[in-house]
Amino acid sequence: MDSENSSSHSISSPQMFQNTHNNSAMEDNLLSRPMNNESLQMIIGYLRRNGLTETEELLTREAGPVLRVEGSNGLPPEEAISVEFDTFVQHANDCTDVVQAEFSQLLFPIFAHSYIALIEKHAATARIFFNRFKIFIPECFSEFVYQLSLIEDAMTLRANEHVHILRENKFLVRLSRPTLKHLESIQTRVIGVKNIIAKHICIENADEVSTNRTTIETQMGGILGVTSKSDKRHKMMFSVLKDELMQNIEKRKTKGKDWKDMGKKMQTHCPQADRIPLPPISEHLREERRNWLRDVGKMAIISAESPVSICMYTTVNAPIGVASCDFTDDSSLIAMGLSDSSIVMNAMDPMNKMKKLRDMEFLDKIDIETADNVQSQMFDLQGSTTSVRYTGHGGPVFSVNFSPDRRLLISSAGDRTVRLWSMETQRNAVIYRTPAVVWQAQFCSRGYYFATASADKTAAMWSTDRMHPLRIFADPYGDVGCIDYHPNCNYIAGGSDDRYVRVWDVCSGTRVRIFSGHKASIIAVKFSPCGRYIVSLDAIGNLMIWDLAYQRLVAAEITEQAGTKGSITFSRDGGVFAVSHGNSSIQLYSLDTLIGTVLAAGQNDSYIEPKVNLDGFNIGSYATKETAVIGLHFTRRNLLLGFGCFGQ
């Protein structure tokens, strides 16, 4: 980055050393002074500004004892913290733009632990320190800085959740070798800062030296810093076995040409079929896939040259508000979770009404062996309807989701229950009681299992025949607000308020991937149909695409579309995905374009620069007039369905 851009990102300091003399005057002035701490710091600053790195390091090493003895000018410890933090900020300001960006990772944890140390014994001094230096903390940590501002004394300190997290865990940063050399040179002058780094911060060596500031900043934002390289040790079976349906979709997409997305190689990353116990594929599901197979020839391939067609469904006269929605896989039904604790089910086609199973007395009279058209006799055709309302929850319904075979609906609400509804009897079948609110519940692609994201900082895996979770994943540090099941049913992804995206193995219960880079709470997460990529969305509108194979950030789309309810859905061929931020617009992105760019840059490289606001990645933006888009869904022919509540 050039010097002009570098200066635009500088970290200011309240005690900047301003030199108005020329070089010769500086030398004469310094040589005429006794070699005390102040003179040594002036000389070191002069050497740094003139690029004399080796001389600076040599002088710092030789003058270490003097600097350590007089490191804080003999000030009391509570005042020395301010002096040392200001010195650290000034040192970062004198560095190059990339090194300065790496140093900025250290500012928040040093600031936080300095403030925590002061507030316990010197509350008044702590407030002065906080108000003076809070403006130097990167914007991505502003929410955490606000949480620290709520601490007024030792009592509120002990009750603060963020303080417990920072004290019990080390903050992780990743620095390149040049930055580590700068850090070694400054630590001899700021002993208090050095002690904080040694006790509360873990520093890893960066594999590659970043070439620009943006690359470093895209990975910042987590409450405990970036993710560790040691998390890559877990092997992940992220691929999806390609059956006849998937092969036909791929053939339709490529028009007979060879697809270059490592298709053959990815087959080696498929899990064993018996790795987890899955229910057998029912005849109903087989029939659904045969129907889908017949639609493959009519499936549209979406691109920038061939834009998507969107059908928007809007609900009106709903003053209570709609909190959630979901479509069946065949797009025949839509379920709406309302804020008044009820669920409304509508048939998308008025001619295809919902049939209700007859009562038990009538069913007992049917002779299965001799009766004709048993299926038609089991259902009350005259009582079929296009709309059904379910009641039973005691709070807003935050999530609804259909099972793959369309026989069950799962819902979660503010009453701390997850309910399983039978589509055939149109009644509540099971109630799962949870210790906290469940923000989202999601079936796996084979049914039977489902996952939940909860306000008690956990994600969980359940089965429809058990009343208690089979797995509980308790490593997040904040509410898990969104969740998704991997297409091969072996993994669960969750996004939480601590700004990390995590992937758990449902077989072993271990966390196999963790990603950092979001700057706010994560409100939506989605696996790609191929199983290799994850798309996540946060509350301030940032969109991130992660590669599970290399555990890396592939691309980031920085927007200003803040929202609290996000929706992500992939096209049936997996080449495009649609995103809504809970506002009145729909964004379309091309995953194929992104993959092509990564392939051109060298797919086998374990390190690539994340693509930020990549040209050609966003292939369309579609706005509604006043309707907030709550849910999105691609039909089997790649028609995009949107759902929203007018005026919400």
From Swiss-Prot:
Residues 35-67 form the LisH domain. The gene is taf-5. This is Transcription initiation factor TFIID subunit 5. Its main location: nucleus. Residues 1-13 have a biased composition (Low complexity). It is found in: Nucleus. It comes from Caenorhabditis elegans. Pfam families: TFIID_NTD2, WD40. Belongs to the WD repeat TAF5 family. InterPro entries: G-protein_beta_WD-40_rep (IPR020472), LisH (IPR006594), TFIID_NTD2 (IPR007582), TFIID_NTD2_sf (IPR037264), WD40/YVTN_repeat-like_dom_sf (IPR015943), WD40_repeat_CS (IPR019775), WD40_repeat_dom_sf (IPR036322), WD40_rpt (IPR001680). It comes from the Eukaryota. One of its GO terms (cellular component) is nucleus. One of its GO terms (biological process) is transcription by RNA polymerase II. The keyword Nucleus applies. WD repeats lie at residues 317-358, 392-431, 433-472, 475-514, 517-556, 560-599. PANTHER family: CANNONBALL-RELATED, TRANSCRIPTION INITIATION FACTOR TFIID.
